[in-house]
């Protein structure tokens, strides 16, 4: 009898754990899918769709620039990037986690992009990113914080450049 009770308890416990894990996996997959769709929107240079993935109170922390804390400032960052004729971008999530509450998650991954530098020369870049997402009341995920930086070494000023100022 004790064996039956133990087996039943273990079976129910494992079943409950599987249900919990399946829910988390489903939420993580939904977040991964949202991030992948966002990457496709940016790759197709669709400004409106790209910016639509941000929450109303989002903050973007681009490298070597001030934080963008308004929708207009975020739109300007993307507008400037997408306007470059040589601009190509893609990113892929390598880690996705959703809080137990189910309404907050983060994505980290890698990106590749090409765009023109100040002289018009195409520059290839690759790096990593982190996004913090919020699940809204309508069930859609929106990015509340977005930051990225390059894996490439920072370029050094030309010798004597500081002295010429």
Describe the residue ranges of each PLM region.
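Short, low-complexity N-terminal intrinsically disordered segments enriched in polar/charged residues
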Residues: 4, 8-12, 18-56, 155-165
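A solvent-exposed, acidic/Ser-Thr-rich amphipathic alpha-helical stretch
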Residues: 28-32, 47-102, 108-110, 115, ...
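Short, acidic, Ser/Thr-enriched surface-loop or helix-capping motifs
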Residues: 55, 117, 136-138
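Glycine-rich beta-strand-turn "strand-cap" elements at beta-sheet edges
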Residues: 92-101, 147-152, 160-164
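A short acidic/glycine-rich loop-to-helix N-cap element
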Residues: 118-123, 153-159
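Short beta-strand edge/turn micro-motifs at domain boundaries
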Residues: 126-154
């Amino acid at each position: 009898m004790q064996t039956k009770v133990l087996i039943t308890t273990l079976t129910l416990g494992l079943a409950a754990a599987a249900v919990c894990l399946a829910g988390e996996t489903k939420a993580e997959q939904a977040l991964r899918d949202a991030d992948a769709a966002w990457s496709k929107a940016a790759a197709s240079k669709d400004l409106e769709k790209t910016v639509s993935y941000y929450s109303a109170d989002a903050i973007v922390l681009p490298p070597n620039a001030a934080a963008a804390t308004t929708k207009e400032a975020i739109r300007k960052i993307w507008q400037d990037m997408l306007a470059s004729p040589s601009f190509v971008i893609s990113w892929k999530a390598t880690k996705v986690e959703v809080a137990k509450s189910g309404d907050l998650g983060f994505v980290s991954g890698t990106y590749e992009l090409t765009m023109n530098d100040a002289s018009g020369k195409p520059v290839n870049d690759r790096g990593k990113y982190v996004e913090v997402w919020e699940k809204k009341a309508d069930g859609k995920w929106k990015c509340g914080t977005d930051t990225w930086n390059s894996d490439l070494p920072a370029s050094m000023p030309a010798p004597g450049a500081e002295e010429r100022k």
